[in-house]
A protein has these predicted regions:
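A glycosyltransferase accessory/donor-loop signature
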Residues: 1-12, 155-162, 171, 175-342
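N-proximal low-complexity "stem/linker" segments adjacent to membrane-targeting elements
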Residues: 1-30
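Short, acidic, metal-binding catalytic loop of nucleotide-sugar glycosyltransferases
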Residues: 35-43
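Short internal beta-strands
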Residues: 45-51, 122-124
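Active-site-proximal specificity loops/subdomain of glycosyltransferases
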Residues: 51-90
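Short aromatic/hydrophobic "clamp" motif used to bind/position activated sugar donors
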Residues: 95
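The conserved acidic donor/metal-binding loop of glycosyltransferases
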Residues: 99-103
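Conserved donor-nucleotide/metal-binding helix-loop-beta segment in metal-dependent transferases, i.e.
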Residues: 106-144
């Protein structure tokens, strides 16, 4: 049942999504939750969303899809606005926060068990790759040659910088979560002192990134990331058409996973022939070409140039659900008319 809630615990374990802005983002959440319910029908799902999106949920009769509705103020209706303040939304004892452009691929029970070892964590890599906060093209070579990343770490007193991937965040410690968020805000204010490129410079992006600032905050507080790349037990993997086999409804998903992090980082390049060339070149070195076919818990459509299959899937799911609701209403109307005539 859909209902607004106040700041109190709503259960032991639960999922939290966020939705604001264009109605298509609500469609994405609906599609993601549909895939989650293939594997987990018990844990509650809360949606933090604006009033406009609440009205759309009620208009289309999707109340039963969410267990709880959380009012999202406009000041938090952005990537940075929400993820630098998500300590305000710990509505369960143990919380998994999810991006809307995620498809669930298998039962998450063992993922929950693994995350329980942490008070707070975000999926990521111990060492950030070459593309983290940098140009998503061959232009990243300039940052490498000029040692910009190294200078950023020295300036902020860091000895390492993890790669945070905030498509999946976990928390069961409100105080620690607030500390991370507050420090991330401070890091973002000092962006001019870093080598990071504004996310708005990427084609199709109109919001600033929260990831590098959260990663720097976690490094400063020495909080470990939850290993993003774990082979067969990976919590989430990027959707890369070049490396992913799947059916139209994403009920069958297999990702080609390169065991060497450096080789796997080539997935970020937009041009397939360049990716293929680099992978083949480095595969000459023993071990560099080792790979496996894996099914992650989540398939994340985080790369803008790889989102189209998810857009098509979410459109189809939304249209089918709306059609089902209309059919149900029509059937109820016929039953009521028959009863009155009788």
């Amino acid at each position: 049942m859909l209902k607004s809630v106040t700041n109190k615990k709503l259960g032991k374990e639960g999922y939290i999504y966020v939705s604001y802005g264009h109605p298509k983002y609500l469609e994405h959440v609906v599609a993601s939750v549909t895939t989650l319910r293939r594997y987990d029908t018990k844990r509650p799902v809360a949606l933090a969303c604006t009033k406009k999106h609440q009205d759309l949920i009620k208009k289309y009769g999707f109340e039963e899809m969410f267990d709880h509705l959380i009012d999202l103020p406009e000041k938090h209706a952005s990537i940075v606005g929400f993820k630098h303040n998500f300590f305000n939304y710990l509505y369960f004892d143990k919380n998994i926060f999810l991006d809307s452009d995620i498809v669930w691929c298998k039962n998450p029970d063992t993922l929950w068990q693994s995350l329980d070892a942490y008070n707070f964590t975000i999926t990521g890599n111990l060492v950030s790759d070459n593309f983290f906060g940098a140009p998503k093209s061959i232009g990243v070579a300039k940052d490498m040659l000029l040692l910009r990343r190294k200078r950023t770490l020295k300036r902020f007193g860091l000895t390492y910088l993890s790669r945070a991937q905030t498509g999946l965040m976990y928390s069961k410690d409100p105080a620690l979560t607030k500390n991370v968020c507050d420090l991330a805000k401070e890091m973002l204010k000092r962006k001019a002192e870093t080598h990071f490129q504004s996310r708005k410079m990427e084609k199709g992006r109109n919001e600033e990134s929260c990831e590098w600032s959260l990663a720097m905050a976690m490094s400063k507080l020495n909080i470990p990331v939850y290993a993003w790349f774990q082979g067969q037990t990976s919590p989430q993997l990027d959707y890369i058409a070049f490396l992913t086999d799947h059916d139209d409804d994403f009920e069958y998903v297999k990702c080609k996973y390169y065991c060497n992090d450096f080789v796997y980082s080539f997935r970020g390049l937009k041009t397939n022939w360049i990716k293929n060339l680099l992978i083949k070149a480095f595969s000459i070195i023993p071990g560099k070409g080792d790979h496996m076919m894996v099914t992650p818990y989540c398939l994340h459509f985080g790369w803008y140039h790889e989102k189209q299959p998810f857009f098509e899937f979410s459109d189809r799911v939304w249209d089918e659900l709306v059609s089902d609701q209309n059919s149900s209403k029509a059937s109820l109307g016929l039953e009521d008319r028959s009863s009155n005539e009788a």
